């Protein structure tokens, strides 16, 4: 009787540990997906300057110049694609 009770307690303990590990892996997977989504958005948005940079001269504004992937046109002063 005592052995049966010990086996039952150990099985419950192992199952609860397994559920805890599954919960951590799901949370880790969600965090990884969120991080990769943010990085993907940053990478794909790199070539598109923000709205406030579209009418500015990128030679004069260093913050807008960083968004120019093709460089800044010395003649027009806008981003080259």
UniProtKB/Swiss-Prot annotation:
In which tissues does this protein get expressed?
Expressed by the venom duct.
Q: Which residues form the signal peptide?
A: 1-23
GO molecular function annotation: toxin activity
Q: Does the keyword Secreted apply?
A: yes
Q: Where does this protein reside within or beyond the cell?
A: Secreted
Please indicate which superkingdom the organism of origin belongs to: Eukaryota
Q: Which residues form a coiled coil?
A: none
- Kindly give the InterPro entries that the UniProt entry links to this protein: Toxin_Pg (IPR026210)
- Using the UniProt record, give the first listed, main subcellular location: secreted
Chain positions found as 4-hydroxyproline: 49-50
Q: Which GO terms describe its cellular component?
A: extracellular region
User: Which Cys pairs are S-S linked?
Assistant: 53-68, 58-72, 64-79
Does the UniProt entry include the keyword Membrane?
Answer: no
The entry's keywords = Disulfide bond, Gamma-carboxyglutamic acid, Hydroxylation, Secreted, Signal, Toxin
Q: Which family does it belong to?
A: Belongs to the Pg turripeptide superfamily.
Free-text note on domains in this protein's UniProt record: The cysteine framework is IX (C-C-C-C-C-C).
Q: What is this protein called?
A: Turripeptide Gkn9.1
Q: What species was this sequence derived from?
A: Gemmula kieneri (Kiener's gem-turris)
């Amino acid at each position: 009787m005592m052995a049966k009770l010990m086996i039952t307690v150990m099985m419950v303990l192992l199952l609860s540990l397994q559920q805890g590990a599954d919960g951590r892996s799901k949370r880790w997977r969600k965090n990884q997906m969120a991080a990769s989504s943010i990085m993907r958005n940053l990478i794909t948005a790199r070539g598109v300057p923000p709205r406030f940079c579209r009418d500015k001269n990128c030679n004069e504004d260093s913050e807008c110049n960083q968004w120019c992937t093709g460089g800044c046109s010395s003649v027009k002063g806008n981003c080259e694609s």
